[in-house]
Curated annotation (Swiss-Prot):
Main location group: nucleus
Keyword terms of this UniProt record: Cytoplasm, Flowering, Nucleus, Repeat, WD repeat
PROSITE patterns: WD_REPEATS_2 (PS50082), WD_REPEATS_REGION (PS50294)
Subunit structure, as described in the record: Interacts with UVR8. Interacts directly with DHU1.
Keyword Nucleotidyltransferase: no
Inducing factors: Circadian-regulation. Expression increases during the dark phase with a peak at the beginning of the light phase and then decreases to reach the lowest expression at the end of the light phase. Induced by UV-B.
InterPro entries (UniProt xref): RUP1/2, WD40/YVTN_repeat-like_dom_sf, WD40_repeat_dom_sf, WD40_rpt
Miscellaneous comment in the UniProt entry for this protein: Overexpression of RUP1 confers an early flowering phenotype.
Protein purpose: Functions in association with RUP2 as repressor of UV-B-induced photomorphogenesis mediated by UVR8 and HY5, likely in coordination with DHU1. Plays a crucial negative feedback regulatory role downstream of UVR8-COP1 to inhibit UVR8 function, balance UV-B-specific responses and ensure normal plant growth. Is involved in the regulation of photoperiodic flowering and vegetative development.
Protein name: WD repeat-containing protein RUP1
């Protein structure tokens, strides 16, 4: 089994071993405190607003096992702009697409449920739908350092960029800013490249925020602002203004290991993930202030995924113990934890959660998709309790 390993400090080598891992069933984090001064043995709720609680009744809704006989770790999961189509990519060199409504019709194993798939020339690390094609064109970043865009309906490539010198790409993203479409990619070569997808992928800007350290994550402000957040193997995250890329606006330097992800919760708040085993929420309007640090999941060497649900205020991370951890942005402890493992291809000691994605189009219904190092997808959904 091949995993998606993070670049490490100082020389960005790829780690070659996997921790012993174990899975467990779903549970919620302890939320009731016992008062030591109470004469009764009954639990007493103290400072209820400060006690983590899960406001969403999440449960398993569908499973998609991997039909592959080889390595099939899922490195990327993306909903299209409508929230109906799920695209996945990873080690198997395929972009698979699924229709969410079809998967939710039953809880049977949907091993053959893929609406379509596209074979790619290299292993994939990232996917992102182009916002100007209404879910028809998807961009991918691969291990050969190439960004390729595919027409999902026709299942053919429509453009290709090979500007990272053959160094693997870890992240791609797009934004529509003031009517202009901009693409970005981050790579092991230490650069973030931005280009015009409508003009043959013409390179517009290149920045090197970490002095040559690998770039693990790029994300534009999804609310239409001019910021881009960058996660870097030098242990920092950077925020740039795309109108002036000479220097970063902010350097977020609270992590002790590689920053694998940087996600916008809103235009003023960024959540970062790191192989130091923590997530951090940052107030970027007030310099580099850490609002909250989230701990509970296990992450020391792999890309495990990070997704935020902007409507519901949730932060979701995968984990190297094959569990999904859901945090409410208000509290540092997880409010919901669930072990994957409805397939047993490799045995529980070798699996971990390698990608997660939250559906963004709903406000009163939560849909969470988690992908594993065994190539399986599990979909959880639920309404507000």
């Amino acid at each position: 089994m091949e995993a998606l390993f993070c670049s490490e400090i100082p020389n960005n080598n790829i780690r070659s071993s996997i921790n012993d891992l174990s899975s467990s069933s779903s549970y919620t984090w302890p939320m009731i405190m016992t008062s030591s001064s109470s004469s009764s043995s009954s639990p007493t709720i103290m400072n209820i607003e400060n006690i983590p609680r899960c406001d969403w009744d999440l449960s398993l809704s569908a499973v998609v096992s991997s039909a592959s006989t080889g390595s099939d770790a899922i490195g990327a999961i993306e909903f299209d702009p409508t929230g109906e189509i799920i695209a996945t990519g990873g080690i198997a060199r395929k972009i698979r697409s699924y229709r969410l409504s079809s998967l939710l019709e039953s809880r049977d194993d949907h091993v053959t449920a893929s609406e379509s798939y596209i074979c790619t020339p290299a292993k994939l690390s990232s996917l992102k739908w182009r916002p100007d094609f209404s879910g028809r064109v998807i961009g991918s970043g691969d291990y050969d350092g190439v960004v390729t865009e595919y027409d999902v309906e026709k299942q053919v490539p429509v453009s290709e960029r090979d500007e990272h010198g053959g160094r693997r790409i870890w992240s791609v993203d797009y934004t529509l800013y003031n009517g202009s479409l901009i693409g970005a990619s981050g790579s092991d070569d230490g650069t973030v490249q931005m280009w015009d997808p409508r003009n043959g992928g013409t390179l517009e800007e290149t920045v090197r925020p970490g002095g040559g350290a690998a770039i693990c994550s790029v994300e534009f402000d999804p609310f239409g602002g001019s910021s881009i957040a960058v996660g870097c193997a030098d242990r920092n995250a950077y925020v740039y203004d795309i109108r002036r890329l000479v220097d970063p606006l902010i350097v977020l330097d609270g992590h002790t290991k590689t920053v694998t992800y940087a996600r916008f919760m809103d235009s003023h708040t960024i959540v970062t993930g790191s192989t130091d085993g923590s997530l951090k929420q940052w107030d970027i309007d007030n310099g580099r202030r850490v609002v909250r640090t989230y701990r509970g999941h296990v992450n020391s060497r792999n890309f495990v995924g990070l997704s935020v649900w902007r409507h519901g205020g949730l932060v979701v991370s995968g984990s190297e113990n094959n569990q999904v951890f859901v945090y409410d942005k208000r509290w540092e402890e997880p409010v919901w934890v669930c072990g994957l493992g409805h397939t047993n291809r490799f045995g529980s000691d070798r699996r971990f959660v390698s990608s997660v994605c939250l559906r963004q189009v709903d406000e009163d219904w939560c849909t969470l998709v988690a992908g594993g190092s065994d190539g399986a997808l599990e979909i959880f959904s639920g309404k507000q309790s």
